[in-house]
């Protein structure tokens, strides 16, 4: 894993909520090992996801590697605005991508590299 890659996981969509806004869906997903939970707002017109879809999620500090950009189907730039301790030695990290929000909860061992800073989110099927 590249030094700029802060998180690299495979997730499966457990639900899709399309009710809030046009062209925006809020998905909930669980990682392949069921140790991380994700809630993510996405532009469903550009990158539609359905229940039970599997996708790769990477969070990086930069896009200096051309391989990262070329492999991704959907990229967002945002800011980690809150990191808090959750129950059972878990951490919750909150990111805003220009109003599209992400919350991810998981083990401190996997999320420790995410801090209050700007990040890139890369998704691919």
Curated annotation (Swiss-Prot):
Q: Where in the cell is it found?
A: Nucleus
Q: Which SMART domains match?
A: RPOL8c
User: What does this protein's UniProt record list under function?
Assistant: DNA-dependent RNA polymerase catalyzes the transcription of DNA into RNA using the four ribonucleoside triphosphates as substrates. Common component of RNA polymerases I, II and III which synthesize ribosomal RNA precursors, mRNA precursors and many functional non-coding RNAs, and small RNAs, such as 5S rRNA and tRNAs, respectively.
What GO cellular component term, any one, is given?
Answer: RNA polymerase II, core complex
Provide the GO MF annotations for this entry: DNA binding; DNA-directed RNA polymerase activity
Please name the source species.
Answer: Schizosaccharomyces pombe (strain 972 / ATCC 24843)
Q: Name one GO biological process term.
A: transcription by RNA polymerase III
Can you say what this protein is called?
DNA-directed RNA polymerases I, II, and III subunit RPABC3
Q: Which UniProt keywords apply?
A: DNA-binding, DNA-directed RNA polymerase, Nucleus, Transcription
Q: What subunit structure does UniProt give? A: Component of the RNA polymerase I (Pol I), RNA polymerase II (Pol II) and RNA polymerase III (Pol III) complexes consisting of 14, 12 and 17 subunits, respectively. Directly interacts with POLR2A.
């Amino acid at each position: 894993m590249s030094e700029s890659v802060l998180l690299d996981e495979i997730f499966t969509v457990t639900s899709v909520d399309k009710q809030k806004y046009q062209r925006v869906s809020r998905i909930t997903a669980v990682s392949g090992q069921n140790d991380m939970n994700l809630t993510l707002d996405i532009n469903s017109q550009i990158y539609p996801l359905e229940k039970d879809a599997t996708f790769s999620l990477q969070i990086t500090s930069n896009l200096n590697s051309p391989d990262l950009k070329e492999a991704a189907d959907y990229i967002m730039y945002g800011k980690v605005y809150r990191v808090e301790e959750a129950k059972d030695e878990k951490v919750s990290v909150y990111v805003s991508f220009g109003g599209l929000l992400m919350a991810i909860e998981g083990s401190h061992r996997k999320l420790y590299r995410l801090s209050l800073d700007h990040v890139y989110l890369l998704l691919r099927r």
